[in-house]
Amino acid sequence: MQRSRAQVALVFLVALLLRVIGLADFLTADEVHHWITRTERFSAAISGGRWAETILTGHPGVTLMWLASLGLHLERTALAWGWIMAPDRLGHLAWLRLGPVLAHALLISVGFLLLQRLMPRHALLAALLWACSPFLVAHGRLIHLDALLADFCTLSLLAIILAYREPPQRFWLALSSLFCGLALLTKGPALIMLPSIGLSMVALALPPPPTWTWPSGSTWVVRSIMGAIPRYLVWLGMALVVVVALWPALWVVPDQALGRYFSEIIGNGGRANGDGQFFLGRSDADPGPLFYLISSAYRLTPIEWLGLLCIPLFMWHQRGTFDWPMGLVLGGFVLFWFFIMTSGPKKFDRYVLPAWPTLMILAAWGLNNFSAWMRQQRPALRWLSPVLLAFQGVTLAWYHPYYLSYYNPLLGGGQVAQHMFLIGWGEGMDRVGAWLTAQRDINEGQVLSALPHTLQPFLPVPVQAVEALDRANANYAVVYRESLQREANPDYYARIQAGTPLTTITIHGIDYAWIYQLPKAYTTPWPAQFGSGLYLRGYSLSHTPQQLTVTPAWDVRRPIGADLLLFLHLYDSTGTRVAGVDVTPGGDAFPQTSDWRSGQQIAVPIPLVLPADLSTGTYTLVMGLYDPRSGERLPLSIGEAANPGMAGANALWLGGIEIANDS
């Protein structure tokens, strides 16, 4: 008993710690656009007794909003007692995530207790794989539906197996109904559980005939179906009671609630993703029948793969003692879920998460049998299973908190996966924000980005969508991989990507984002190039009787490698220099041109003081750059050169300037 309690505590702590540490990391698009607001509105509706207002989405997401509301209540309690300061957007998100995270840890622990009764030798490893699979951990840290649906579906399935294996049957039947009801309140695909549980009851109702013939087999099928029907109807009735009890909208406006529920399934789930998908290197609204097989292969770890690959071998080896009914129920559920998801046009890899814990249970069975076989061959390998599990733990530590970036390294990991699957849900925006915030000129304009609300909490300046390129006073633009894969706004991105990216945000081999600086504004287009990498887009000019101010708009296309000075000279009609200045072209903000990066856009006003006695007339303005150590000018390779007899070699002619001296 003491050992069992310790194991339950271990499973709970592992599941909790992997999901609770560092919850204020980044926002996913669905959280920031949907679930934060839905949770706040749901909580307010419950508090005010406005039951009809608990219809916030057709998913319906009721269990998720209940759990996130728990986190919201904990946050408000901590604020009221003065335990915390008012949290920012990310801190608020972390509190809302806390409720679902606690639920995951508790539900996985319940799963372990059920597995102890079904397969005591494999229960601990199965529960730990359930707790430690990167795919489940990644989604279990979010305010989102699929990981929660996975827990409820798996527990309902395990409980129905126990209903046919261990008394009291009514208790396990009721427990399975409870979890199925919670699954139905979470997301529409839980309807798959209704035929799944029915078929499981048929498979478990009676022992199969020892010798399978057509008469004996058909008799067994008929008797199993007839025996399962009464229990199934009771089970279904209890599940529906749970649904009605926990969704207040069904108490007052059941027609509206159910209408939204089925409209979501038919209207949203029954069509290809409106924002597009990406698979095997091309944008495709419906990725086709191989999508889940290939994407799941990449989401599994090598250890999980090993366990699954061992299953056929040890099933054959133990064919005389293998628990075929339970194997049929578990394996059949996985295959059935994959089949239904594959048959629909809308596909995301997370849609098969409800089958993932069952896959982990099967993988644990395979791993334990493999370890037992290895121990027979080499007794020194008795610690193989713990070592493999420890390796999985090291993998999780390495990927924290970017578990969504995990792809099987044996298949090329993220470096290969980024060219095969749609990648980017908001992860990496924290690093984008950190890099941009560190730039000296970050406050000189707005930032453009896909998924702007996922980036905004990390920046001190406004973030707008890429579509605002022509109307926003934008300084930087973020090109996010997901948008390129979906071929969103191709014209805007083509213009942004015409430049050179300042940096690439790479996480675990995946290039998530490229940061570009947008061209600085100028009034006079004047293309020119100095050396091999410093390009002038144009310039702006203003003047007073005392001063000319020239603002060149530079585009750094290659590193310069030296600290240059800029000269700005003014000549009269006789070719005599009447004013000039030699300064650093980047001013105080970017004084050393050797530090200028490829892709950087720089526009610093250069003041040129005019002599007080300068007469009215037309003057020639020239500009160039030189190395102050050698005095050598940077070659002018593009642009109209000034008269070398007047201005010297490699001086750019900026045109004639009319100056009126009113004194």
What are the residue ranges of the model-derived segments?
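Short helix- or helix-capping micro-motifs
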Residues: 11-15, 126-131, 138, 158, ...
